[in-house]
A protein has these predicted regions:
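Extended, hydrophobic alpha-helical segments in both membrane/secreted and soluble proteins
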Residues: 18, 24-34, 157, 165-172
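Short hydrophobic/aromatic beta-strand immediately N-terminal to the Walker A/P-loop
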Residues: 15-19, 47, 155-156
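Short, surface-exposed helix-loop/turn micro-motifs enriched in polar/charged residues
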Residues: 14, 46, 161-165
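P-loop (Walker A) phosphate-binding loop of NTP-binding proteins
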Residues: 21, 51, 160
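Short acidic donor-binding/metal-coordinating loop in glycosyltransferase active sites
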Residues: 18-20, 122-123
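Post-DEXD/H (motif II) to motif III coupling segment of the RecA-like Helicase ATP-binding lobe
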Residues: 128-178
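SF2 helicase/translocase NTPase motor core
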Residues: 1-8, 12, 26-31, 35-149
Length: 178
């Protein structure tokens, strides 16, 4: 709790990696941060990006522990929305990492929006690495750079921030540069 209230919230903009052991409470820390930023009017529009297997868990935990209601993005909701851009219609949204990284249409729709805070869970999946002198940027890494440009506050959460190679860690940390 002190990490959220004493260390992170006073810094503006908030752009950092939250790296801790599995089951160490990263989701709770993110929830506290989201709730507090919402109460302070620093974050009205919040997007959470996570692996598909975790989206409903995020939705449930944010509702049950923090009283925050988030919608889940889906192809069906996008197809049925009146504005033709579900991302623009929702102020609190959870989307699947691979659904966004593999779909250029969704990225084009996202490009038309701005977010106060974007949280990425399992952010180590947005990796890039050096192969000789060349940088190999994955689609997920490109998504991470793209998301960083859509928001003022950017939180990357991971239990495994790097693979032991300093160059790859520097590439991962560059996602925060926005």
């Amino acid at each position: 709790i002190a990490a959220v209230y004493e260390t992170r919230l006073p810094r503006q903009p908030l752009r950092f990696v939250l790296a801790d052991d599995p089951e160490a409470g990263k989701t709770v820390m993110a929830g506290l941060l989201i709730r507090e930023m919402t109460l302070r009017a620093d974050a009205r529009r919040v997007l959470i990006v996570s692996p598909g297997s975790l989206t409903e868990q995020w939705q449930d935990e944010l509702r049950e522990k923090f009283g925050l209601d988030f919608e889940l993005f889906s192809r069906e909701k996008q197809e049925q929305c009146h504005s033709r851009n579900y991302f623009a219609e929702q102020d609190r949204l959870i989307a699947r990492l691979d659904q966004l990284s593999r779909n250029e249409e969704y990225q084009q729709l996202l490009a038309q929006t701005e977010w106060d805070l974007i949280v990425v869970d399992e952010a180590h999946k947005m990796s890039a690495n050096y192969f000789g002198n060349k940088v190999n940027e994955t689609g997920r890494f490109k998504l991470g750079k793209f998301l960083g440009g859509l928001t003022r506050h950017y939180l990357l959460m991971t239990a495994t921030p790097h693979n032991g190679k300093e160059e790859d860690l520097q590439l991962f940390m560059s996602l925060l540069d926005g």
